[in-house]
C-alpha cells in the first residue's frame, strides 16, 4: 500500500480524487480503440508509424537549463525554457500524413484542467495546453522536437508517452521510467514567477551550494559554514517527498507562493511530522545537538529514507539552512537572514510588550521576548495575491513559533510567510 493516501474527493462537479503524491503515477494503456467510426485518412505509404525509442538528450538539456550539477540520473529542466527531445520511429516521420501526440503526466489522476495531463502535437497551430512544441529536424528515422513547458506549469516529476494516431486507434509507447523528467522553477525565464534578472544573484541564490549562517549576538557576531548541498544525491527526491508527505495537491504546485508556504510548515515537525524536531533544552541524548549539524544533506536524506520520521534536533539556524536547501533545490532564489536583538511576538498583536513588576523586574510570564539572534529565509518571487510593488524578496520562517492560518493546510499550522 502506498505511503500516501489520495486526497479527499473533490466535492464539485468533477467528483474525482485529487492527487497529492508525485510518487504515484498512472500507467497508460498501450492501445486505445476509437469509440466511434469516423472517416480516417488513408494509411501512409510504408504502414503505420511506430515508436521505437525516446531520447531525452539529458546532457545537452541539463547544461542549457543549469541543472548539470544535480547528482541524479534523470533529465532535469526548468519551466518556461525549451528542451530537446528525440523520437525514433520505425520509418521516417512525415509531418503531412503522420500524426502523433506527446503526453506528459504527473500524479495518479492526471487531467488537463488541473495541468496534470499535458498533450502537445507537432504541426498543430492550436495546442490543448500552454506547452509549446516544434519540429527541430528529422534525420533518418529520428525526429527531434523542441518542447517548451509553460512558465507556470507544475513543478515535479513527469512521465512521458508518445501516442501515434492510426486508423484503428491510439498506439501508445510503453511506460519507460528512463523518460521521466523533473521540471523546476526557472529564475532565468522572464515569464516565470521566480524570475531573477541579475545573473550574479542567480549564481549565488540558486546555484551556490554552500554558505555562511551568522549567529552570536549584536556585540559579538559569529558565523558557521553550512553545506546546503541542494545538488547532492537524494536531495531532489527528498524535496518532492516533503510536499507529498504534506499531502499538497499537485495542482497547486505550479504556484511558488503555495509551494513556499507549504514547505515552511513541513520543515518543522510541530503539527505535521515535518523534517525537523526542535529543542531548546540542553538535553540532546535522543538525537543530534543543533550545534553539531554542518549541513542539510544528512538531515534530508535521513528524513527521506525513514519516510517521514522527524529528525532530532534543530534550532533556528538549522531550520533556515535546511529550508534554504529545499528552496534552491526546486529552483527558487533563496538566502538565509540573521536578525540580531530579534523581538518575538508571543500573542500575534504585532507589538513587543515588555512588562515589569513593581520592583522593576521583567515579568517573563506576560512579556514578549527578545532573542540574541534569529534566522529565517528570504525567497525571491512575484506576488500575484497582493499589489505588484510588494514582489521581490519575501520573508519566510520555518522555525515553529506561533500558529498561522493557511489555505492549504487543515485548521491551524505552524507556518510563516510569504511576507514582503
Model-derived regions: residue spans:
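Contiguous beta-strand segments within globular domains
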Residues: 56-106, 142-146
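Short, compositionally biased P/S/T/A/G/V-rich stretches that sit at domain boundaries
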Residues: 2-82
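Conserved beta-strand elements of beta-rich interaction domains across eukaryotes
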Residues: 90-94, 107-109, 165-167, 188-190, ...
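Eukaryotic intrinsically disordered and solvent-exposed regulatory patches
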Residues: 70-74, 88-89, 132, 145-149, ...
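Hydrophobic/aromatic-rich core segments of domains that either
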Residues: 296-420
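Secondary-structure boundary elements
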Residues: 191-335, 345
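Nucleo/cytoplasmic regulatory scaffolds in medium-to-very-large eukaryotic proteins
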Residues: 2-11, 16-26, 77, 107-112, ...
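Extended acidic/polar, glycine-enriched regions
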Residues: 94-213
